């Protein structure tokens, strides 16, 4: 495979990295998918799945886009429910968050820059 292009399947490729497709955490052997600039995740969450504890001290900007399902996002600024295909939320550095899949859900998460935690 060439270093500057890649074609794949998000569900299949994400199985190795908890859904993450791009980011600093992918080894250089992953070519163009190894990035310090951006992280991309294909998240498949069954109803009831969630992160109850808050993700704190976040230093990246994030967009979470609902592909299907119903997904609750709890931010330090309030609670928001993404329920229509294409609904999304964007938050910047310093915003704490947790989440809960209210129905079987698929979401795309993009964070930048890609930073070690």
Regions found by a protein language model. Give the residues of each.
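A short, N-terminal "cap"/entry segment at the start of jelly-roll beta-barrel domains
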Residues: 1-47, 51-54
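Short histidine-centered beta-strand/loop micro-motifs
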Residues: 32-34, 51-58, 75, 81, ...
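A short hydrophobic beta-strand segment most commonly corresponding to one strand
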Residues: 43, 88-90, 103-117
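Short, conserved beta-strand element in jelly-roll/cupin
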Residues: 56-72
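Residue-level recognition of conserved beta-strand positions in structured domain cores
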Residues: 67, 75-77, 101, 109-111
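Short acidic-glycine-tyrosine-enriched beta hairpin
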Residues: 77-94
């Amino acid at each position: 495979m060439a270093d500057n292009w890649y074609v794949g399947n998000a569900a299949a490729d994400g199985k190795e990295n908890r859904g993450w497709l791009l980011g600093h955490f992918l080894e250089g052997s992953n070519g163009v998918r190894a990035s310090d600039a951006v992280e991309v995740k294909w998240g498949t969450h069954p109803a009831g799945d969630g992160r109850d504890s808050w993700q704190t001290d976040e230093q990246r900007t994030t967009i979470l886009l609902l592909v299907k399902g119903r997904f609750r996002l709890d931010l330090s600024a309030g609670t928001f429910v993404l329920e229509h295909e294409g609904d999304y939320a964007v938050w910047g550095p310093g915003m704490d968050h947790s989440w809960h899949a209210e129905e079987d859900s698929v979401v795309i998460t993009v964070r930048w820059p890609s930073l070690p935690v």
